[in-house]
């Protein structure tokens, strides 16, 4: 029966596509993790010093109004680095596409409330994606060495992006959330890793670049 043959053909096609997607996810994930394995730090005493820490943005609140632990833990990690003298300046890069949504300003406010002087904080309002944040750190803010501050899964991908864009980067891992709370984020991250390789293959550029800003001047 012709219709049955076509139906079976469609099933096989979907199965092959699914298998290829799974293989792609596994390969991309392993490659990113292996690349970052010697460049990630969780102990402040072992972390090398860099002039600038790149703090990757996120919202202070979840959609349900609860505190976003990813935000809180990244702030704590940044404070650890700053107070230990492991970074001199903090570049906060995040999303400010909407008038009432401003990741960099919220993070700046949280850091200043905990004692970081404003003169040591720089803001990048066009960090819409990790790619934008990393590339702009070099092209706009002139950084060729960075300590990237986020959770481990995010740092791994950011380090890979940084190296592909000529930046010598390490990552300082903020505390992660528990597996249940972070399940959706962790699943999304797997697909983000595949997309990162596609972006690199097509030489994807940030949404915006703009005038140069000198950190520490």
Predicted regions and their residues:
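Short linear elements at protein peripheries
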Residues: 204-217
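A transmembrane-helix-recognition feature enriched in membrane-embedded lipid enzymes
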Residues: 183-205
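Single conserved hydrophobic/aromatic residue that forms the stacking wall/gate
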Residues: 1-12
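A structural signal for short, hydrophobic/glycine-enriched beta-strand patches
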Residues: 28-187
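A general structural signal for short secondary-structure boundary/capping elements
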Residues: 97-102, 170, 192-199, 215-217
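Hydrophobic membrane-insertion alpha-helices, especially the h-region
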Residues: 13-26
């Amino acid at each position: 029966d012709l219709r049955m043959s076509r139906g079976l053909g469609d099933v096989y096609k979907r199965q092959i596509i699914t298998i290829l997607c799974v293989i792609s996810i596994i390969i991309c994930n392993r490659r990113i993790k292996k690349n970052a394995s010697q460049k990630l730090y969780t102990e402040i005493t072992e972390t090398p010093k860099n002039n600038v820490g790149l703090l990757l943005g996120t919202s202070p609140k979840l959609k349900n109004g609860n505190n976003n632990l990813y935000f809180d833990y990244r702030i704590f990690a940044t404070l650890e680095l700053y107070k230990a003298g492991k970074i001199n300046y903090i570049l906060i890069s995040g999303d400010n596409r909407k008038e009432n949504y401003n990741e960099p300003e919220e993070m700046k406010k949280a850091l200043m409330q905990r004692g970081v002087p404003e003169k040591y904080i720089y803001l990048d309002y066009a960090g819409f994606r990790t790619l934008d944040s990393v590339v702009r750190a070099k092209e706009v803010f002139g950084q060729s060495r960075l300590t990237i501050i986020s959770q481990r899964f995010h740092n791994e991908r950011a380090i890979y992006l940084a190296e592909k864009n000529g930046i010598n980067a390490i990552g300082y891992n903020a505390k992660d959330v528990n597996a249940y709370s972070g399940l959706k984020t962790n699943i999304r991250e797997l697909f983000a890793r595949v997309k990162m390789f596609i972006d690199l293959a097509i030489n994807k550029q940030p949404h915006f670049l703009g005038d140069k800003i000198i950190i520490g001047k």
